[in-house]
Amino acid sequence: FFSIYNVPAFVQGLGSLAAARRAMERLDAKAMRAGLEGVHWNLLAFGTPVLPGEQVATDQAELQRRLGANSSTSYVWVTHTTLPDRETDYNLVRDQYMAHWDTVRTQYDAPYFPNITVGWDASPRTNQSEPWVGGGGADYPYMNIVVNNTPENFKKVLEMTKERLLADPNGPRALTINCWNEWTEGSCLEPDTLYGMAYLDALKEVFGR
């Protein structure tokens, strides 16, 4: 399993789509010579860039086809959603992402692994000596944040995602979670002083049985 985060930058770095595809095929062949089944190529899809320098493909589905992707996923909800309020409710962002999932699952040829995002607050990465006001059009890390991302709401989206995955007998049985320890982006599963083990407990309660 090999996941490529910034696919346009990967292609650009190798010189062309054709060159990138050849490099992927060479690694795939090398894995098979080593006795493996080959490389499962997972490509991250972006709707809008978040970090400075990130690039977005104009046609994600075509890019995946031309590179021979085995699957795709997303890194975080906010690359596919909007944060209209300075403090945007978690459940609103969840519903936007679920609508995005409904769209791409019919557009992409390869299976799409849905993402579950714990939260989003990049304000710790701002200049702490200056006022932070956020704003719908503000650049990272001065963008709006997500609130109400409680363990209970996180558990709810885990249940929703599990139900959707199991409802499709031919669909994937995989998902991604953002994130284990992005403390300065407000998205972390690790135990903390506010909720303790609650996020991990929610994950265990939904998928541990």
Annotate the PLM regions.
Residues 1-209:
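Glycan-processing catalytic domains of CAZymes
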